Amino acid sequence: FHTNWKRAVKGGICGAAAAAVVIGGFGFLWSRSGDTFSEKFRHTMIGAEQEDTFRLLSVDLSENTVALHNADTTLEVSANSSALSPQQLTFTCNGTEIVPQISADGTCTFAEPELQHCQVQVQTDRLDFNLGYATPLETIREADGWVAVGIGKTELKTVPKTCDSEKIQQCYPYLNGRVFVWANTISVLGDCWLLGHGPATTIFYLNQNDLPALLNIFSTYVLYNKPHSWYLQIAQDTGIVSLVMILGILVLFLVCGFRKCFGK
């Protein structure tokens, strides 16, 4: 009887702790904005303020054309000369030429529903795409084609992708951008099997110029200096073998603790 009483107390404490975590999680979820459970969950994961955007996934730059892509829409802006003006640009949406409304300051807006979150600010040698984010996507017209402006005003002839999968790209903003940082870190672990890159080196290895990802999370002025995951940090710093060993110790600890709490 004495042994069963101790086991029951241990089980009750563990169960109460687990229940408190679950109830607290649902309470926080219910406090979020939204009329339905799915809306509340989405606002918890991604943030309501990010909904009214173009949801940019990739940017293609060629000699004459800047192409912006999301899951359903492609906006292309083409120029045949180095001097830019709204009247000299050609705009197409999903392959169909469209005519923008042009304001006095050179801002182009569009009547198409797919482009309701798109504005193009035309300047002498550049286009600024205001897509509903905290900062615009900046592109510059040069003699040999277009370049995008990246971190630290770096001029990019191509905008690098962290991952080619659109499904994964659409998940980048979730968990306050952590999904992007995790995918970014995993993409650079190919040479970290035995030895890692060393501590405090993450900032030098991550893709810092994935502009669509940065726009969808915070802005194009944000640098990432850590994976925001203890496990990925270990793999990147000291190697994947080191991570596997630590995970083995953690699993052993959890199994032994579970047996101690509920088992014989």
Regions from the PLM with identified roles:
Residues 240-264:
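Hydrophobic transmembrane alpha-helices and their immediate junctions
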Residues 5, 33-34, 257-262:
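Membrane-interfacial segments
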Residues 18-25, 250:
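Hydrophobic core of alpha-helical transmembrane segments in multi-pass integral membrane proteins
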Residues 145-224, 238-244:
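TM-adjacent membrane-interface loops and short helices in multi-pass inner/ER membrane proteins
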Residues 3-18:
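Membrane-interfacial entry segments at the cytosolic side of transmembrane helices
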Residues 26-187:
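Flexible juxtamembrane loops connecting transmembrane helices in multi-pass membrane enzymes
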